[in-house]
Amino acid sequence: MENVLGLVALACGIIIGLGAIGACIGIALMGGKYLEASARQPELMNELQTKMFLLAGLIDAAFLIGVGIAMLFAFANPFVLK
């Protein structure tokens, strides 16, 4: 029982940590490509900015889904029988 709770805590930390790293890298790459594209074609900056913010929201949403799953495992763990 104690072993399962310890492994669940470790798994929650890994889910949140790797999700945060992935979201940060994804948003950084997307922001860099947005700057490159807006430097090449400044007339498309407003359209590209709208698409960039939509994609940033989707990337953050995927991370927050991972956080929600980690919180489910942390507080309402389906693997521990009470």
From Swiss-Prot:
Keywords: ATP synthesis, Cell inner membrane, Cell membrane, CF(0), Hydrogen ion transport, Ion transport, Lipid-binding, Membrane, Transmembrane, Transmembrane helix, Transport. The chain crosses the membrane at residues 7-27, 53-73. One of its GO terms (molecular function) is lipid binding. The record marks D60 as: Reversibly protonated during proton transport. It comes from the Bacteria. It is a multi-pass membrane protein. One of its GO terms (cellular component) is proton-transporting two-sector ATPase complex, proton-transporting domain. NCBIfam families: ATP_synt_c, PRK06876.1. F(1)F(0) ATP synthase produces ATP from ADP in the presence of a proton or sodium gradient. F-type ATPases consist of two structural domains, F(1) containing the extramembraneous catalytic core and F(0) containing the membrane proton channel, linked together by a central stalk and a peripheral stalk. During catalysis, ATP synthesis in the catalytic domain of F(1) is coupled via a rotary mechanism of the central stalk subunits to proton translocation. Key component of the F(0) channel; it plays a direct role in translocation across the membrane. A homomeric c-ring of between 10-14 subunits forms the central stalk rotor element with the F(1) delta and epsilon subunits. Belongs to the ATPase C chain family. This is ATP synthase subunit c. The lineage of its organism: Bacteria, Pseudomonadati, Pseudomonadota, Betaproteobacteria, Burkholderiales.
